[in-house]
Amino acid sequence: IGLGDYLDFASPSNRQRLRSAALYDAAEDTIADKALELVFDLFETALKPSVGRWLGLLEGHHFYQLKDGTTTDMRLCEMLKAPFLGSSVSGLLEFPNPRTNKGPGELWIWVHHGAGSGETLAAPLSKLDNLAKRWEGYDIFLMGHQSKKIGGSVDHVMPLRVGGQLHLIHKTRILACTGSFMRGYQEGRKDGLVPRGNYVEQKMLSPTQLGAPIIYIEPRWHRIFEDGKERREVWQPDLTIVQ
């Protein structure tokens, strides 16, 4: 799943200023052509091998709006043969039960590009943790935006009554901030002939570990027995995050 900001161009304030500039059509077309060139370069350089393997791509804060009503994010989706998911998405993954025909196990995912900022490593994870408390039934929460790669798992305990017995079912939730592929401090970086750091360096922000976390999903059903007989199967997948 893509979480947005695939290009550094253009931020919301950049887009607003370009709109207010009342440029001639030729100038607008030149900017649009350059924006599409950046998309094509990203596709050819890094993403081409992943065509057809995406569940979808979200919109971030950085994109360019084209005259035909589409955006550079939507054009990237076309290249990757992936659906465009907008601002956020609730996704459902289904896992068939190999033992019965009672229906698949359902894994719900909540995904958002993200918003806000924070200096500490735990800042985006704390934001995600607070939000997750309001969303019942979800198993995985993903957020981008802040460029930090950090995640964790928490267990929720739910009561379940089977026949006359009360059982406690433990289900794992994954919370993950999905990282970045933009290095903050680059030796010898220049703008033209001027030695100048990028946004991260200029704002004296903390460097972050590059890459994205990996989440492993192992389908599993917990079998409940009473008096030596199986009474019920409960969907209880094993979820693990590796950073």
Language model region names:
Residues 1-243:
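Extended recognition/assembly regions associated with phosphoester-bond processing machinery
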